[in-house]
């Protein structure tokens, strides 16, 4: 099952990668046209996107983090975030990550860039 947004302004969708580029239980770093880095996750066949940089420090979640179910752990201070919502789940992280609406179409992963200013 994929995480699909029902109503999306198609002008705000940006293609990031193919679904085959993100292995089950893995994290892939991608960049928006603005250069802003996102982390793409695949859990149980669903795809999720958050900002790639931990809200507590400057660690890349895709490069240094680890995925455990629906939570990503930052390797710097072991804070955790729910990849579905961006919610901070473990200290020292107090501020959520931005999570991005994901659409999967034709084997491609898109995010709604209208969801957040970058």
Curated annotation (Swiss-Prot):
Induction: Induced by p-cumate and repressed by CymR.
One of the protein's GO biological processes: catabolic process
Residues reported in the UniProt entry to bind [2Fe-2S] cluster: 54, 56, 74, 77
Superkingdom assignment: Bacteria
Cofactor(s) needed for function: [2Fe-2S] cluster
GO MF terms, alphabetically ordered: 2 iron, 2 sulfur cluster binding; metal ion binding
Binding note for cofactor: Binds 1 [2Fe-2S] cluster per subunit.
Segments forming domain Rieske: 14-111
RNA-binding found in the keyword field: no
Swiss-Prot/TrEMBL keywords: 2Fe-2S, Aromatic hydrocarbons catabolism, Electron transport, Iron, Iron-sulfur, Metal-binding, Transport
Function: Component of the p-cumate 2,3-dioxygenase multicomponent enzyme system which catalyzes the incorporation of both atoms of molecular oxygen into p-cumate to form cis-2,3-dihydroxy-2,3-dihydro-p-cumate. Functions as an intermediate electron transfer protein via a specific interaction with iron sulfur protein components (ISP)(CmtAb and CmtAc).
Assembly notes: The p-cumate 2,3-dioxygenase multicomponent enzyme system is composed of an electron transfer component and a dioxygenase component (iron sulfur protein (ISP)). The electron transfer component is composed of a ferredoxin reductase (CmtAa) and a ferredoxin (CmtAd), and the dioxygenase component is formed of a large alpha subunit (CmtAb) and a small beta subunit (CmtAc).
Protein name as catalogued: p-cumate 2,3-dioxygenase system, ferredoxin component
Pfam families named among the record's database cross-references: Rieske
Pathway where it operates: Aromatic compound metabolism; p-cumate degradation; acetaldehyde and pyruvate from p-cumate
Family, as annotated: Belongs to the bacterial ring-hydroxylating dioxygenase ferredoxin component family.
């Amino acid at each position: 099952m994929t995480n699909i947004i029902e109503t999306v302004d198609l002008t705000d969708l940006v293609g990031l990668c193919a679904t085959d580029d993100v292995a089950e239980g893995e994290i892939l770093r991608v960049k928006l046209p603005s250069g802003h880095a996102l982390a793409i996750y695949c859990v149980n066949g669903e795809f999720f996107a958050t900002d790639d940089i931990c809200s507590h420090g400057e660690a890349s979640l895709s490069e240094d983090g680890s995925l455990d179910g629906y939570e990503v752990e930052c390797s710097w201070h072991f804070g955790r975030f729910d990849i579905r919502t961006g919610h901070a789940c473990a200290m020292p992280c107090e501020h959520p990550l931005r999570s991005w609406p994901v659409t999967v179409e034709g084997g491609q992963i898109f995010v709604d860039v209208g969801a957040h200013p970058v």
